[in-house]
Amino acid sequence: MVWKRARRPEQIEQRRADILGAAADLFEAKGIESVSLTAIACRAKISKANVYRYFESREAIYLEILRAEVELWVTELERILAPLAGSDDVHAFVTALVDESVSRPKMLALMAALPSVLERNVSGEVIREFKRSILGFALRINNASNVALPSVGIEGMHHFHTFYINFMTGLYPATHPAPHVAEIVAEPEFSFFNRDFRQTLFDQSMVVLRGLLAK
């Protein structure tokens, strides 16, 4: 492997992008449990030792991928919610929110792995930086949502998104089990466990928002 140290800012950014791209590709192909830092380094054509110049661990790499995915999600939500400004159209709002969320399986899978995997092998500094970014994105999505559904109110919308993120994050892995489990829950005897992710997320979001509006 021929490796040259990146010195200029654009070279450093390119090296980071190569590492992130390699990690994202491996994640989509194998899932996070099967991806090692060695595999990421090999895919990015960089030595494992030099990966540490850019990221402190495998988990730090995936935290950055998740941060970027959430930013894309929020930016797109701002765009698609803008036409609903002042409408108080709960059905249209939930449809837009859920459909945009469902379209981002990488983000959903990484969110599901956040507490049990991604936050386990990183420094406090990395966690703080990640959480600060997420707080900024939360403010943006709350603002866009309040513009679309002003009757819910700022506090009500905060409660809704707290519910939404936590419910979505827990629901995704429950509705995307391992293949052998999926075969079993598809049997009539176990239909109770066979839930559709989008429909369940949509239905529960409608219930919560209507409840907030009824207060």
Roles of regions detected by a PLM:
Residues D18, L26, K30-A60, E64:
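Helix-turn-helix
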Residues E64, E78-M107, E129, M157-Y164:
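Hydrophobic alpha-helical connector segments
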